[in-house]
């Protein structure tokens, strides 16, 4: 389980852990090993030819990998039969990916994952700090397996500080950073009606991966990108609060429809929000619908197959 005490933003910033996070960048990009420079692969899209392993679930991590997929990356979502999933979140956050089952506690499946790592550019995970290191898949171990790999770590409390070992979700981040404290009425704490920390963290994670890939292309190296829900909560809090006196800013049905796309999934046609970011020459889009969990083989597409999928 996980949880957190309701704090004001001032209480959070004066706490030991809040002070640690306040002294760090929102997106940490740490060079952890040397390797030769690797120019980005040639292709028609920003991330054509980039391969990403996505070992995340629920929201923030899947959003990060989904963002890579909408820009042309071959994203393979790795999960295990029996791991808890939320169907609605799976349908919303995995457009453009493939999905396979691997049990990391199985020696055979762990060996298969290591083989996938050797062909990967990005490895994204959302376990508590140190969890995957105990299984031989920490950032440093991964950099030895595949020099030049970009590791993305997503957590609730970040990698350093007295709370770094704790797990947590969107609600925990809102609760401890002051969002919940200030969001209620009549001094009663209340959560935001949306997963703002999760989505913000996912997009920041993808942004960090892009910066790390650019650095790898220029100077080489393996990189560890770190983002956290609490850092995102602190960022959101700093933007200030809207006044109840301000007019309603909800989108109309016609505006929502204009921003939506339809995917033909195994569960049937799915109408959902399209990519948020728009580029004039390389428009982000997904070439695959949300996959069936475990419905793909644990292997990379060949160059020709990846290129066709990226178009």
Annotate each predicted stretch with a short phrase.
Residues 177-193:
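The feature captures the short pre-catalytic strand/loop hairpin that immediately precedes
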Residues 73, 77-104:
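Glycine-rich phosphate-binding loop and adjoining beta1-alpha1-beta2 segment
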Residues 53, 98-144:
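A structured beta-alpha segment of the ubiquitous adenosine-cofactor-binding alpha/beta core
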Residues 72, 96-97, 120, 169:
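Short, well-ordered alpha-helix to beta-strand connector turns
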Residues 103, 122, 162, 166-169, ...:
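Hydrophobic alpha-helical scaffolding
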């Amino acid at each position: 389980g996980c949880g957190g005490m309701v704090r004001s933003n001032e209480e959070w910033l004066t706490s030991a852990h809040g002070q640690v996070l306040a002294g760090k960048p929102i997106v940490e990009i740490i060079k952890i090993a040397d390797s030769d420079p690797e120019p980005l692969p040639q292709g028609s899209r920003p991330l054509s030819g980039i391969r990403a392993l996505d070992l995340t679930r629920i929201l923030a991590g899947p959003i990060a990998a989904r963002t890579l997929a909408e820009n042309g990356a071959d994203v393979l979502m790795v999960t295990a039969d029996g791991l808890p999933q939320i169907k609605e979140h799976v349908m919303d956050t995995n457009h453009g990916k493939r999905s396979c089952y691997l049990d990391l506690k199985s020696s055979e499946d762990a060996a298969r994952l290591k083989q996938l790592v050797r062909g990967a550019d990005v490895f994204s995970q959302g376990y508590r700090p140190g969890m995957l290191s105990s299984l031989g898949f920490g950032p440093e171990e991964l950099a030895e397996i595949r020099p030049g790999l970009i590791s993305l770590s997503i957590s609730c409390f970040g990698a350093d500080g007295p709370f770094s070992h704790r797990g947590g979700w969107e609600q925990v981040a809102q609760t401890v950073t002051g969002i919940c404290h200030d969001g209620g009425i009549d001094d009663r704490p209340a959560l935001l009606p949306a997963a703002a920390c999760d989505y913000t963290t996912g997009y920041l994670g993808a942004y960090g991966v892009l910066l790390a890939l650019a650095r790898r292309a220029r100077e080489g190296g393996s990189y560890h990108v770190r983002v956290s829900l609490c850092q995102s909560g602190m960022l959101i809090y700093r933007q200030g609060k809207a006044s109840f006196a301000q007019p309603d800013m909800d989108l109309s049905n016609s505006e929502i429809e204009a921003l939506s796309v339809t995917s033909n999934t195994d569960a049937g046609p799915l109408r959902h929000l399209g990519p948020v970011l728009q580029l004039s020459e390389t428009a982000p889009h997904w070439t695959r619908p949300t996959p069936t969990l475990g419905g793909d083989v644990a292997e990379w597409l060949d160059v020709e197959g990846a290129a066709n999928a990226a178009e």
